[in-house]
Amino acid sequence: MVTKYSSIFMSPILSNPPILYFSDCSREXYQKXLTN
């Protein structure tokens, strides 16, 4: 069960950019860090 849940929760996190899980403020700061 541990591996099953790990695959369910980890797969979307690894496949999708972490920026999608940030709030708007964090997202802006994250993009600024990438652009600068």
From Swiss-Prot:
Q: How does activity depend on pH?
A: Optimum pH is 7.5.
- In its keyword annotation, does this UniProt entry include Hydrolase? yes
Any one GO CC term of this protein is: extracellular region
Which modifications occur after translation, per UniProt?
Answer: The N-terminus is blocked. Glycosylated.
Under what name is this protein listed? Zinc metalloproteinase-disintegrin-like VaH1
GO annotation terms (biological process): proteolysis; venom-mediated fibrinogenolysis in another organism; venom-mediated hemorrhage in another organism
Q: What is its EC number?
A: 3.4.24.-
Q: How is its activity regulated?
A: Inhibited by EDTA, but not inhibited by iodoacetamide, PMSF and pepstatin A.
The record's note on quaternary structure and interaction partners says: Monomer.
Which tissues does the record link to its expression?
A: Expressed by the venom gland.
The record's remark on the cofactor is:
Binds 1 zinc ion per subunit.
Show the GO MF annotations.
metal ion binding; metallopeptidase activity; toxin activity
The cofactors it requires, by name, are: Zn(2+)
